[in-house]
Amino acid sequence: MSTRLGFVFTLLLLYWFKTMWAYTVDFNLDIQGFYQVFLAVINPIPLSLLFIGLAFYIKRTKLFYLLSFSIYVILFIWLISNSIYYREFTDFVTVNTMLASSKVSAGLGAAALELFRPWDIIYILDFPILAFLFLKKLVKLDPRPFNKRASFAVTSLSAMLFSANLFLAEIDRPELLTRGFSNYYVVRALGLPAFLGYSANQTYMANKERSKASEVDLKPVEEYVASHYAQPNPETFGLAKGRNVIYIHLESFQQFLIDYKLKVDDKEYEVTPFINSLYHSNETFAFANVFNQVKAGKTSDAETMIETGLFGLNQGSFMVNYGGTNTQQAAPFILSKNGYQSSAVFHGNAGSFWNRNTAYKQWGYHYFFDASYFTKQDDTNSFQYGLNDKIMLKDSIKYLEHMQQPFYTKFITVSNHYPYTTSLIGDEIGFPLAETQDETINGYFATANYLDSSIKAFFDYLKASGLYENSIIVLYGDHYGISNSRNPALAPLLDKNSETWSSYDNAMLQRVPYMVVIPGMNKGKVIETYGGEIDMLPTLEHLLGIDSKNFLQVGQDLLSPNHSQIVAFRSSNYFVTPEYTSYSGRTYYTKTGEEITNPDETTKEQLDKIREAANLQLKISDSIQTGDLLRFYTGNDLGKVNPDDYSYNNSMKALKKIEKEKGDASTSLYSQKGNQSTVDLFKAPSYKELHPEQFSSSSSSSDDSSSSSSSSSSSEKK
């Protein structure tokens, strides 16, 4: 290390070691065979040598050491950022993600700290050691500069190594960079610095795509939409026509929670009793095989799909990157053209989170009630992702009752949000924790139980106020709550073996609830049809008697007998059908979970056909989204949203003004009740009030112990 060359190669070795640590401990790169191991071992070297080696061109001693170490620190930050990001998103940081970071960082706070692990000390151990060596002058600065020829030789060597790396990577995975198989393929083959360049190019191409798009690009889109359209089921078309629409967003809620009973100390606890009752009600169309189709945009991806019938982006969040600029024909705007008088979103977090306050205007939402409209947040009523659900729902009533009917609304809950250890406070603590080595999993069931009781309180209000009978209530889970990296720890709770846990099991855990409650209907049932979030909008439209035929949407009505049942995940070549599941580069029989390793020709043809259909659906959606093609579309009479028509300031004043102007013609609940408020009809008892027997005597000591553990965990996380 006492020479310039030695110092650079020391930094190179340290970066290589840390990368190997990340590949082994944090990333799931599905490395198989000697060839892929070899690629993974060599890929950190070429570009790190290229970048750190740039310092060889510097003659001044201190500047050489400062520059080389600074480049090393930048590479380190990129590595550790991806390691932490991967733990939650099971993906890598893209340029779009970084560009959007200011829009999604509000409210993250302590949740980011939850992603750190004890072994992260490995990533930073070298910094104090290097500082000690230089401060004690155990390593001396080398004043001898490299000549230009030697410096260029290092640059050339790194370029040759990268070329060789790329050549070998193409042998392992042909068209690696052109077909965009998966981000982890690129990282596995070329490393994180190369992935950053790949991502930057993808972002540039996306922006370029929009600038060069024209009306001509609409033709294949319109042809696809026409051929993909699924005729509505005549038995369900218009079944809920004219009713208020109430969407309830079930944060991080996975399908396996339905009917699940958590066993603690030989006693079973039903996690979501009320939601279970809705699932099995004859007033509910409940879907057993609907999958989330989100990627890094997570909640924003889910919102994009249910509102627009189009996918989120392969990289980053559509709402953040395009939501405030693209022309869109979303549900609130469509319904406003079909007799709906008002629309609103209720969400107890900052309006800027996921760029909602801008994207919602492009979607045509009349009102957006964010955290500024609700009870002031403090340690007793909220956590880093917003106001707790019961309080948010109660605070929403004073606005909801003034909305003109029929209305279209969405309530975004947050309490069942990662890390599941900080949102429950005081008398809401009591549901037992699971008993695994993962605190995130342990708390997941308690926060889901809290969400369940919040939803019950809201339904009770709807019934007491009279809104229930004239509404259609749609409940949906937005994305997974337990990430794939944690699923093996979850496995025993699902009667599965952690050692044999597979990509098939991960795929099946992408199911999320989708329930359509139509009060007064007796045709409800549990439906086994396979579908995804992309299908929710056309399903709702047809239930409301609005034909989706002339809308540029790529989903299909889940109640249609013509529904294709091909579910495309956002990652290319990931899909699920009733017959086959393709996930993380492996293919399985969906019914049995048996891996297909040597498919016959018939099976190959079927898989190729499904893969082509899934990828085409994503391609068509992406062309609409990245090309902003709806700005050219004239295939319906909706027209275009003017975002300047909407303001989310002083919304209560605006609601009351409309009531006053309409007078006796006002259709708001407040007007219908003779200008009497219904706020007091909302009752949301705490867990302690709902389960007094659990706290009333010493005979319940085991349950009290669980509660105490939960309280302690919550305090520690705060």
Task: Briefly describe each language-model feature range.
Residues Q36, K59, L63-L66, I80, ...:
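Generic, low-specificity signal for short hydrophobic/alpha-helical stretches with a mild N-terminal bias
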Residues V41-I42, L190-M205, S252, N470, ...:
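Conserved acidic functional residues
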Residues M1-S199, E689:
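Transmembrane and membrane-interface helices of multi-pass
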Residues S83-V95, E114-R117, K208-D217, T299, ...:
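A diffuse structural propensity rather than consistent per-protein peaks
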Residues V225-K718:
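Solvent-exposed soluble domains appended to multi-pass membrane proteins
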Residues N165-A240:
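Membrane-interface segments at or immediately adjacent to transmembrane helices
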